[in-house]
Amino acid sequence: GIGAKLLAALPAHEEGAKAILIEAECPEKADDEAMAVRRLGFYARCGAVDTGWTEHLFDAWFRVLVLPAKGETLDAETANKELADCYSRVMGADKWRRYVRLYRPDGTEEKF
């Protein structure tokens, strides 16, 4: 459908990007678990890889996914460091540390 076409075209619009980072709602924390599972399936069919990391952003929980761009990709650790850096720059360090938490697959919090 159109969503898959849009997602497939996105890397071409981000020149120089190794990957596109996607935050998808965690099914086990979602109001609509079935919809969240379908979204994860959609992203997987489009080539996105679940890093195994989760993110707590304000009051919502997300899985961190990586969509490779131009045959390149980011490993899970680097992807999450980049995500943390993005939020820190956009929100400012104080708000970022207050409202954003990243967790490794084993559940331990990572403070980049």
Locations of the language-model features?
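Conserved acetyl-CoA-binding loop-helix of GNAT-fold acetyltransferases
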Residues: G1-E15, V37
